[in-house]
A protein has these predicted regions:
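Exposed, low-structure sequence patches enriched in small/polar residues
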Residues: 1-30, 38-391
């Protein structure tokens, strides 16, 4: 009589992660766009300095439990240090030094043509936490069809920029220790057929969504030339879903490659609030491509045209002082078509490419932006040569 071992493999390990970031916002002279600033002994320059340090110790156990599947256990000890060095008269703390401990469990099991998996991630301290629970199944059904279904729930504290920020600019100093944790529930589905077709979708419910917004509210007729950015949390839950379809249809030497995405957000906006998570309702990208082999199959070429389009929406813009994107409900961008031409060639170890971007810019109007304050580039031509000396 024989007895199969319940554990086929077992391994212990340790991992150490150290991360260091230094951010320095410098201006020879402060500008009015960010509002008034502190002038120390007549010094009107801006030199805001911040440092972020992460130290993470990870102890893990990986095991294969035979019929029960693969189980991985981890324990993390995390220390953060986020400090500011600024010339400011505001009486606020200059650093955050939190610590956190976490337990993680990952399980995966293969049964026939299906893979099942489960993730559990919990923080032992109540502040600066990040919790997750998720499960999913993926596999094949019928011939050449694949699917993936997942469900997950997240709870996480806002990042450090929302909690503490210091600057020589008077309007950009805050300490918000009582922000609520964000909570996200998500389900997703992905179905594909060979490399020809892929359909995916997801549905999210978000509570306490945390974002930067303009202090003025255009929905109430307010306007602020300084466009001051402040931390904010949504009062009501936000529901967001999207459906994406990708297809690659070969027709002889031609290929039709199409991507279309529909997305929608449902948010009850209270008086004084802004509409957050603003996205274009429709996004589409369509390519017609010709591929061929010439000169006794020694030369490969690809050439074609790509069309891009998205509907209007309130796009976020980048604020360099806080290094974050800011939500605005003042200016919409979008609804401009963009055509790109490309040509690629390869012979042995040499590749050549030419790309003409936004070739329709001169005759389709000039109302095109990549964000509310940054025009999208006009027609541009890029070309290059790649030569590999060794195969």
């Amino acid at each position: 009589q024989t007895c199969a071992l319940p554990i086929l493999s077992l391994s212990l390990g340790y991992q150490y992660i150290h991360e260091y970031k230094k951010l320095n916002f410098k201006q020879d002279r402060g500008v009015s766009f960010f509002g008034d600033f502190f002038s120390v002994e007549g010094n009107k320059s801006i030199d805001d300095l911040s440092r972020f340090i992460l130290n993470e110790n990870i102890f893990y156990l990986k095991s294969n439990l035979n019929n029960l599947g693969d189980v991985n256990l981890s324990f993390k000890l995390i220390k953060w240090k986020n400090t500011y060095q600024v010339q400011s008269d505001v009486d606020l703390i200059n650093s955050l030094n939190p610590q956190q401990s976490k337990i993680l469990i990952n399980w995966k099991k293969k049964l026939s043509n299906f893979n099942f998996y489960f993730d559990f991630d919990t923080s032992l301290n109540n502040s600066y936490k990040s919790n997750k629970i998720g499960l999913g199944i993926e596999g094949n059904f019928l011939n050449n069809f694949k699917f993936n279904i997942t469900g997950s729930k997240f709870e996480r504290s806002p990042n450090f920029n929302f909690i503490l920020f210091r600057s020589k600019y008077e309007n950009y100093n805050w300490y918000n220790p009582n922000l609520k944790d964000e909570k996200i529930s998500k389900v997703s589905l992905d179905i594909s057929f060979k490399d020809y077709l892929n359909l995916s979708g997801e549905y999210n419910i978000i509570d306490n969504f945390t974002f930067f917004r303009e202090s003025a509210n255009p929905l109430l007729g307010e306007f602020d030339v300084l466009r001051k950015a402040i931390p904010n949390q949504s009062i009501n839950e936000i529901k967001y879903y999207k459906i994406k379809l990708y297809s690659n249809i070969p027709i002889g030497k031609f290929s039709l490659i199409n991507t279309a995405q529909y997305q929608k957000k449902d948010q009850a906006v209270e008086t004084g609030e802004l509409s957050a998570i603003n996205v274009p309702e429709w996004i589409t990208r369509n390519t017609v491509m010709y591929s061929s082999k010439l000169f006794n199959r020694s030369l490969d070429i690809q050439t074609g045209v790509t069309f891009n389009y998205f509907t209007k929406f309130w796009a976020n813009y980048y604020n360099p002082l806080i290094s974050e994107f800011v939500v605005q409900n003042y200016k919409e961008i979008g609804e401009f078509p963009r055509f790109d031409f490309f040509f690629n060639a390869k012979i042995q170890q040499t590749r050549v490419f030419i790309k003409v971007e936004h070739l329709n810019s001169s005759f389709s109007g000039y109302d095109y932006y990549s964000d509310p304050f940054t025009p999208y580039r006009d027609l541009s031509v890029r070309f290059g040569l790649v030569w590999n000396f060794f195969q």
